[in-house]
């Protein structure tokens, strides 16, 4: 049995597995949403892999199974299509790890791959947004050195997305 996490860029053969993974990973947060808001959110995350603005979608495999994914965008406008969000640095979105693969370092490996990619591009920082109920994700981001950047928080409905920045 091989316990090595392999990270690659999304290929079309993995698209359906990534869609399922996104739902399986984020479903734990469904109770924080109204039924209509959850339906809109889940539809948005499933269709995200077809977003022409995404720069790279990383896919993590463990034991030849898709167990994680992460999306990397060149800027805040491309990531969120919110003109007021003037982040001109790369943005990480939709970090997802399959529930059965949690605690095995998948999220850490995905994030470090994205960070290394951004460093190789010569960027000086990388951003992401999350919410307070994503407790384990916030802990991982802080462990990797991400710091709160309150100037780039935004809201959709009654949901506040808090910004975190890592200076490289």
Regions found by a protein language model. Give the residues of each.
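Short coil/turn segments at alpha/beta junctions that flank glycine-rich nucleotide-binding fingerprints
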Residues: 104, 121-124
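Residue-level signal for alpha-helix termini/capping positions
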Residues: 50, 119-120
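C-terminal "cap" of GNAT-fold acetyltransferases
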Residues: 21-25, 86-88, 124-127, 131-144, ...
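Acetyl-CoA-dependent GNAT
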Residues: 12-94, 98-99, 111-113, 154, ...
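Conserved phosphate-binding and hydrolysis motifs of nucleotide-dependent enzymes
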Residues: 64, 68, 105-107, 145
């Amino acid at each position: 049995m091989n316990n090595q996490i392999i990270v690659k860029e999304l290929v079309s053969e993995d698209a359906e597995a990534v869609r399922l993974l996104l739902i399986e990973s984020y479903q734990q947060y469904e109770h924080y949403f109204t039924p209509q808001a959850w339906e809109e959110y889940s539809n948005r995350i499933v269709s995200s892999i077809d977003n022409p603005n995404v720069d790279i979608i990383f896919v993590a495999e463990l034991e030849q199974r898709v167990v994680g994914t992460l999306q990397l965008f060149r800027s805040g406008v491309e990531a969120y299509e919110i003109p007021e969000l003037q982040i001109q640095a790369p943005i990480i979105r939709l970090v997802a790890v399959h529930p059965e693969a949690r605690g095995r370092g998948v999220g850490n490996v995905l994030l470090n791959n994205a960070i290394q990619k951004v460093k190789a591009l010569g960027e000086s920082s990388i951003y992401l947004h999350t919410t307070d109920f994503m407790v384990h994700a916030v802990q991982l981001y802080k462990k990797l050195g991400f710091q709160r950047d309150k100037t780039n928080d935004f809201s959709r409905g009654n949901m506040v997305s808090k910004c975190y920045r890592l200076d490289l």
